Every structure is written in structure tokens, then in C-alpha cells.
């Protein structure tokens, strides 16, 4: 049993703060009923950051911090040595396939060493840049849930090199494939990538769930129903393998038999 101490939640692409607030709502509470959590977010757009601050206040989380600036160019949460501050839990839904991710930085000489040992993401696609920022921002036993487009699971070249390096370190422990048309502003199907740095050497594989078919149509959007969410959570927590829906896949199978390709339909 983990001792009751204040754990922090961080969202490097905070937007209006809704994901951060939901993550904070899941934190344990103390005897006085106060959540044992500190909240930190960064959002580059001034107006959106203002909205996030207001959102925190409206949800009784006014002590949460939202800082403004581009996270990849100018991360605002640093330690006393000028390196990235480490967080226990990170949630993030970054801009998909961010074409301007490297504006203002020289990735080869990144002062925060986010790409060391992994490789440089493609100039016009920042999906892995955001992912590697999260990895570098996690404590030694830190955990993260990141919403990403499916492309990061199988695209080749520089991204394949990075993906294989991440796989070799056994940091990814879960992938949940979601229905298309779930998010505003994009019809691209997304997935949740679960990261766990704690005792990574002991991890056996990635637990994959294909939840792409469980949804309700709502106008031109798709929505996850309560039962869809419940099924995902139950299956994931129990690591229950269900034919055509979920499976534990070993790192060896992914790296040796499939060249580091993590596309969920390949395995389920």
C-alpha cells in the first residue's frame, strides 16, 4: 500500500484543462475530504490557458497551476538545475501530428536531452516529440496516459527507430485503440498509450485493447457509452484476454516478429 502522500498530475498540452481536472478527480482524498493531489499544466495559447485557469477554479481546484508557453520550445516546469521537473502522473492529448513542433528549438542539441538515446522525430510530425517530452518528465516510477493518433504505432523511418528504442526499454504497458470521430476537430482514430516506468525491466508486454467498435453515433461524432468505458476499464484492470477484443502481447513478439509495429489489428 502506497503511503498517503500528495502526488502530482501534469498535462504538458493542457488545453482548457478538462483532462487534467478529470485526472485530478481520480486522486485519493484524505480524512478531511481534500484531494491528495497537486495540479500542473502548460498551454501555449494565452486565451486557452486563461480558460483552463478558470476551469480549475470552477472545479474547486484553484490551487492548480497553468503556465503559458510552448511546452516543446520552452517548458516552464524546471528543477533547480534547469532540467525538466519530474512528475508522478502525466495525462496528455497533444495536437496530433504537430507540424511546427520544432519551431524555436534545435532538436539535435536539445538542452533538456529529451531525444538522447531515442532519435529525432520527423521535422513535420511532432507526435513522438510530445511522447518523449512526457517520458523525460516522469519520475522513476512515474505513469502516464497519452492520447495519440494511430500513426505513431506503425509509421516507419525515424519514428520506427524511436518506437523500437521505447519498446526495448519496456516503458509502454498498454494501448487502447479508440473509435474514429471521437474528438472535435479531427476524424482521425486515436489510441490511449499507457506508460509505466516503475520496474520497467520486469514488464512482460503490452496489454492491447481494440475498443474501436464500441460506441454510439451522435450526429457526425461517435461517443463512448458508459458501458463501453466500463468494458475498457474492467478488461484493462483485470488484464482479461477476450478473443477479438484484448490481448497481452510480449515485447519479443512486437520487436522480433513484427519489426516494432504496434498496430493493434495486427495482434487482436
Go through each PLM region and give its residues.
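A conserved structural/catalytic subdomain of Rossmann-like adenosyl-cofactor enzymes
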Residues: 84-268
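Conserved S-adenosyl-L-methionine
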Residues: 3, 7-92, 97-106, 112, ...
Amino acid at each position: 500500500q502506497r503511503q498517503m502522500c500528495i502526488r502530482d498530475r501534469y498535462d504538458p498540452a493542457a488545453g482548457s484543462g478538462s483532462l487534467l481536472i478529470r485526472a485530478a478527480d481520480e486522486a485519493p482524498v484524505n480524512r478531511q475530504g481534500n484531494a491528495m493531489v497537486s495540479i500542473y499544466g502548460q498551454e501555449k495559447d494565452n486565451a486557452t490557458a486563461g480558460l483552463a485557469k478558470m476551469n480549475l477554479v470552477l472545479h474547486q481546484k484553484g490551487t492548480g497551476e497553468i503556465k503559458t508557453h510552448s511546452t516543446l520550445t520552452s517548458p516552464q516546469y524546471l528543477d533547480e538545475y534547469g532540467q525538466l521537473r519530474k512528475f508522478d502522473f502525466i495525462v496528455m492529448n497533444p495536437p496530433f501530428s504537430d507540424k511546427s513542433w520544432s519551431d524555436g528549438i534545435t532538436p539535435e542539441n536539445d538542452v533538456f536531452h529529451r531525444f538522447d538515446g531515442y532519435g529525432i522525430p520527423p521535422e513535420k510530425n511532432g507526435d513522438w516529440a510530445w511522447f518523449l517530452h512526457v517520458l523525460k518528465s516522469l519520475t522513476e516510477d512515474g505513469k502516464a496516459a497519452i492520447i495519440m493518433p494511430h500513426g505513431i504505432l506503425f509509421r516507419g523511418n525515424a519514428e520506427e527507430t524511436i518506437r523500437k528504442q521505447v519498446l526495448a526499454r519496456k516503458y509502454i504497458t498498454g494501448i487502447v485503440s479508440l473509435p474514429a470521430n471521437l474528438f472535435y476537430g479531427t476524424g482521425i482514430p486515436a489510441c490511449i498509450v499507457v506508460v509505466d516506468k516503475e520496474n520497467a525491466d520486469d514488464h512482460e508486454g503490452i496489454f492491447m485493447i481494440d475498443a474501436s467498435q464500441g460506441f454510439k453515433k451522435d450526429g457526425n461524432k461517435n461517443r463512448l457509452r458508459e458501458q463501453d468505458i466500463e468494458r475498457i476499464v474492467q478488461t484493462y484492470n483485470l488484464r482479461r484476454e477476450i478473443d477479438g477484443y484484448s490481448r497481452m502481447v510480449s515485447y519479443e513478439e512486437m520487436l522480433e516478429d513484427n519489426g516494432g509495429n504496434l498496430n493493434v489489428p495486427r495482434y487482436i
